[in-house]
């Protein structure tokens, strides 16, 4: 298995920033964001689209279903939430 390379800047690791679309917003101060990525198949060498669902902390409940948002990695807020909403790129 390959280990993920983490950049360390002055004693702290660089936090990831991802872009995805909101698929659920029924919880209080939480949303579910779907993030797409492309992965190359090891045998057939074809690029496939994979999606990941992430639970994100939304302090103001400002996002709606269908919005394109930017999220950032943060400390664990609950059992499943370790991402926070930075800004809304495109409103639906």
From Swiss-Prot:
Region forming the signal peptide: none
Name of the protein this chain belongs to: Small ribosomal subunit protein uS17
Keyword hit for rRNA-binding: yes
PROSITE patterns xrefs: RIBOSOMAL_S17
Organismal lineage: Bacteria, Pseudomonadati, Pseudomonadota, Gammaproteobacteria, Enterobacterales
Family as reported in the entry's similarity comment: Belongs to the universal ribosomal protein uS17 family.
Gene Ontology annotations of biological process type: translation
Function statement: One of the primary rRNA binding proteins, it binds specifically to the 5'-end of 16S ribosomal RNA.
Annotated keywords: Ribonucleoprotein, Ribosomal protein, RNA-binding, rRNA-binding
Pfam families: Ribosomal_S17
UniProt cross-references to PANTHER family, sorted A to Z: 40S RIBOSOMAL PROTEIN S11 FAMILY MEMBER, SMALL RIBOSOMAL SUBUNIT PROTEIN US17M
Assigned GO CC terms: cytosolic small ribosomal subunit
InterPro entries membership: NA-bd_OB-fold, Ribosomal_uS17, Ribosomal_uS17_bact/chlr, Ribosomal_uS17_CS
Species assigned in the record: Wigglesworthia glossinidia brevipalpis
Encoding gene (name): rpsQ
MF term (GO), any: rRNA binding
Subunit (UniProt): Part of the 30S ribosomal subunit.
